[in-house]
From Swiss-Prot:
One of its GO terms (cellular component) is cytosolic large ribosomal subunit. It comes from the Bacteria. This is Large ribosomal subunit protein uL15. GO terms for biological process: translation.
Length: 144
């Protein structure tokens, strides 16, 4: 069985509506579109957002905000995650190797979350006040 060979059971689906095939079909001549008017013409119907000439809602409402591209290049790493690393110096390269951040991340901030048991040495990472005091209390160091 393949996806391209699947088909519904015979008789389970109604046949496609065939219009313009004589008055006996019930959909001959005007093909169920009535007489004249925009909706009876070929390609004739308004845009999905058309409100009869009234200013459409997406133009009445104000524009709001934007998506900051800064957030895509900065990431947070917790002390608990850093405690699992066995590197002497923890920097962006070490975090990428460990799979804690992806390649698009340009800057990392270490936050106070989780337990830190041993002294660690950070290089080139931002650190919160709480994380800084936790690292330095265990004898770790932070290089900017």
């Amino acid at each position: 069985m393949n996806l391209n060979t699947l088909s519904p059971d015979p008789g389970s689906r109604p046949s496609r509506r065939r219009v313009g095939r004589g008055i006996g079909s019930g959909l001959g001549k005007t093909c169920g579109k009535g007489h004249k008017g925009q909706k009876s013409r070929a390609g004739g119907y308004h845009k999905i957002n058309f409100e009869g000439g009234q200013m459409p809602i997406q133009r009445r409402l104000p524009k709001m905000g934007f998506k900051s591209r800064v957030g895509r290049t900065i990431d947070e790493v917790s002390l608990g995650e850093l405690a699992k690393l066995n590197d002497e110096v923890i920097d962006l390269v070490a975090l990428r190797k460990a799979g804690l951040i992806n390649n698009s991340i340009k800057d990392v901030k270490v936050i106070l979350s989780g337990e830190l048991t041993a002294a660690i040495k950070l290089k080139g990472l931002r650190v919160t006040k709480g994380a800084r005091s936790a690292i330095e209390s265990l004898g770790g160091s932070i290089e900017e």
